[in-house]
């Protein structure tokens, strides 16, 4: 068999971009996108994407391999650009609309972006970002994504900064003779995403056509997404390209329900109006839904994929009681989508609801396309005991892993190591049944008296308190123990009787080992978060440093009072 070699017919580059062309053929007359009273079919979406792609080089002069950025929420243009930009042979860079101008300016310069599509509500943000470019530094062209938003008209001066509007490209583009640019190699870059920076400065993650193709299909299979689902975009498309579902929903001919902003009322209304079947949501969104005054049983089951921070069992229990069917996955920007999921076993359906929620809060096992997953000692690289207690670092092997960090070979080498593994920086235990459970980021593990304290475990106990809305636990220096847990808590709105710090601590003592109980609980109106909704623990650690703690007296200069 030695003469049987790969040939072009059996080794053409993998890419997710072909999903759109197929959707236009198979589901051409079916609804692809809904936004308020606007809707498109898959045939129309395909045509619109081709027209925009044709203009990116011919009208706007962007060359193959260069970067094009998008600063927009979950509106139809944002969805289309996930196809149109790479169909032009250039690299897509979705930027978070919640970032500040300084950060966006750094990202645009770091990526050397040549063109930025800007949503109407982000115009001032992007103009401020571009104004921060050093003198004589080339600035990207700007294209306006206009929207009929009441009271949000742009000034003539602002409009002068834009070469055209998005719909101008749709009108003048060529969908008849233009052929979308297929990658020469499946290893060619397709997207550039910046990490959220929960523990450090954001890094530019580059993914190939191959990795996106693999993780997209893998995520659909693992979640069991059927043909033609109705998918509600509660997950920002700028967050790792919506975990790959921007391309995945096209692969199965689904309907994308777009929304500019969301809260509990909007989500529940859209679910009922469009008979939504699927959505993705960070645990913070699940918490919002379960505590929403509009929360009531759903008219049909809604499958929800959650990820990011480990969801507390109490939040899962409350959300599922409304009719949401929660699946729990694990991934990072560096893997784009879900690569570890809590594969559900039928026999678990017979367990009490509280036990089901506990099992579902675990991250689980590798997805079908992720080749290997392990939890190892970060120093020796040896697998930890499968006892559900011994903590180690999650390591991965598989096609979903990024090419590397843009212009940062040192950071790339730190996580993609010579031993063949990708080191995630996430700390976990492996249970006897082979399911892993994240306990912390490596930087967030609290070492108290020689014991490893999982901040996630302490937070889960706090979340189970009926008055607690959000909780975050960080390490506080302690002269005797080395470190001790320090808790920040927000309480649910409308509480008639607000618990005291003493009552919260007593509650924790009933739930946790003595060395895991926080020494202090600080009540805050809100917790600092990244633009993707993750709690910024590094900010909380800085707050702790300023609070005048004295371990000998076990007191804080401030802190017992509300902040």
Swiss-Prot record:
<feature type="binding site">
    <location>
        <position position="534"/>
    </location>
    <ligand>
        <name>ATP</name>
    </ligand>
</feature>
<dbReference type="Pfam" id="PF13193">
    <property type="entry name" value="AMP-binding_C"/>
</dbReference>
<dbReference type="InterPro" id="IPR020845">
    <property type="entry name" value="AMP-binding_CS"/>
</dbReference>
<keyword id="KW-0436">Ligase</keyword>
<feature type="binding site">
    <location>
        <begin position="328"/>
        <end position="333"/>
    </location>
    <ligand>
        <name>ATP</name>
    </ligand>
</feature>
<protein>
    <recommendedName>
        <fullName>Probable CoA ligase CCL11</fullName>
        <ecNumber>6.2.1.-</ecNumber>
    </recommendedName>
</protein>
<dbReference type="InterPro" id="IPR000873">
    <property type="entry name" value="AMP-dep_synth/lig_dom"/>
</dbReference>
<feature type="binding site">
    <location>
        <position position="426"/>
    </location>
    <ligand>
        <name>ATP</name>
    </ligand>
</feature>
<comment type="similarity">
    <text>Belongs to the ATP-dependent AMP-binding enzyme family.</text>
</comment>
<feature type="binding site">
    <location>
        <begin position="438"/>
        <end position="441"/>
    </location>
    <ligand>
        <name>ATP</name>
    </ligand>
</feature>
<dbReference type="GO" id="GO:0005829">
    <property type="term" value="C:cytosol"/>
</dbReference>
<dbReference type="GO" id="GO:0005524">
    <property type="term" value="F:ATP binding"/>
</dbReference>
<keyword id="KW-0963">Cytoplasm</keyword>
<dbReference type="Pfam" id="PF00501">
    <property type="entry name" value="AMP-binding"/>
</dbReference>
<feature type="region of interest" description="SBD1">
    <location>
        <begin position="263"/>
        <end position="328"/>
    </location>
</feature>
<keyword id="KW-0547">Nucleotide-binding</keyword>
<feature type="region of interest" description="SBD2">
    <location>
        <begin position="329"/>
        <end position="405"/>
    </location>
</feature>
<dbReference type="InterPro" id="IPR025110">
    <property type="entry name" value="AMP-bd_C"/>
</dbReference>
<dbReference type="InterPro" id="IPR045851">
    <property type="entry name" value="AMP-bd_C_sf"/>
</dbReference>
<dbReference type="GO" id="GO:0016405">
    <property type="term" value="F:CoA-ligase activity"/>
</dbReference>
<feature type="binding site">
    <location>
        <begin position="195"/>
        <end position="203"/>
    </location>
    <ligand>
        <name>ATP</name>
    </ligand>
</feature>
<keyword id="KW-0067">ATP-binding</keyword>
<dbReference type="InterPro" id="IPR042099">
    <property type="entry name" value="ANL_N_sf"/>
</dbReference>
């Amino acid at each position: 068999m030695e003469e049987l070699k790969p040939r072009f017919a059996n080794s053409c580059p993998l890419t997710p971009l072909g999903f759109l062309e197929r959707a236009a053929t198979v589901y051409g007359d079916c609804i692809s996108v809904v936004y308020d009273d606007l809707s498109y079919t898959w045939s129309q979406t395909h045509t619109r994407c081709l027209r925009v792609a044709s203009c990116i080089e011919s009208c706007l002069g962007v060359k193959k391999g260069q970067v094009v950025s998008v600063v927009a929420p979950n509106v139809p243009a944002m969805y289309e650009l996930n196809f149109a930009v790479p169909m032009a042979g250039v690299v897509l860079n979705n930027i978070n609309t919640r970032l500040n101008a300084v950060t966006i300016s750094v990202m645009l310069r770091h990526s050397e972006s040549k063109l930025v599509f800007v949503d109407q509500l982000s115009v001032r943000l992007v103009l401020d970002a571009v104004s921060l470019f050093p003198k004589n530094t080339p600035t990207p062209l700007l294209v306006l994504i206009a929207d009929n938003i009441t009271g949000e008209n742009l000034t003539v001066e602002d409009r002068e900064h834009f070469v055209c509007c998005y719909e101008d490209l749709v009108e003048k583009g060529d969908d008849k003779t233009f052929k979308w640019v297929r990658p020469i190699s499946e290893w060619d870059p397709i997207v550039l995403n910046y990490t959220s920076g929960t523990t450090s400065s954001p890094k530019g993650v580059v993914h190939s056509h191959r990795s996106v193709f693999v993780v997209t299909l893998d995520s659909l299979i693992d979640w069991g997404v059927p043909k033609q689902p109705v998918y509600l975009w509660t997950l920002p498309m700028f967050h790792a390209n919506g975990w790959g579902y921007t391309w995945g929903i096209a692969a199965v001919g689904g309907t994308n329900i777009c929304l500019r902003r969301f809260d509990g009322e909007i989500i529940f209304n859209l679910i009922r109006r469009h008979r939504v079947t699927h959505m993705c949501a960070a645990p913070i969104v699940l918490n919002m839904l379960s505590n929403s005054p509009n929360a009531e049983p759903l008219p049909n089951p809604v499958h929800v994929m959650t990820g990011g921070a480990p969801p507390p069992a109490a939040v899962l229990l409350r959300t599922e009681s409304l009719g949401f069917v929660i699946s729990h996955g694990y991934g990072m920007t560096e893997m784009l989508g879900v690569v570890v999921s809590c594969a559900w076993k039928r026999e678990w359906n017979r367990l009490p609801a509280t036990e089901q929620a506990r099992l579902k809060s675990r991250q689980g096992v590798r997805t079908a396309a992720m080749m290997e997953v392990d939890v190892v000692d970060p120093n020796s690289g040896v697998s930890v005991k499968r006892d559900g207690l011994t903590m180690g670092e999650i390591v991965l092997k598989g096609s979903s892993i990024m090419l590397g960090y843009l212009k940062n070979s040192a950071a790339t080498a730190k996580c993609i190591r010579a031993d063949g593994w990708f080191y995630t920086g996430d700390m976990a235990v492996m249970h006897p049944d082979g399911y892993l459970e994240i306990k912390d980021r490596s930087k967030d593990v609290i070492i108290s008296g020689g014991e490893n304290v999982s901040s996630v475990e302490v937070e889960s106990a706090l979340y189970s308190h009926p008055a607690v809305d959000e909780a975050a636990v960080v390490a506080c220096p302690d002269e005797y123990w080395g470190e001790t847990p320090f808790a920040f808590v927000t309480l649910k709105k409308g509480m008639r009787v607000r618990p005291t710090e003493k009552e919260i601590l007593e509650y924790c003592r009933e739930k946790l080992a003595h060395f895991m109980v926080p020494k202090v609980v600080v009540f805050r109106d809100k917790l600092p978060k990244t633009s993707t909704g993750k709690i910024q623990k590094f900010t909380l650690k800085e707050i702790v440093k300023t609070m005048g703690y004295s371990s000998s007296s076990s007191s804080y200069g401030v802190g017992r009072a509300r902040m």
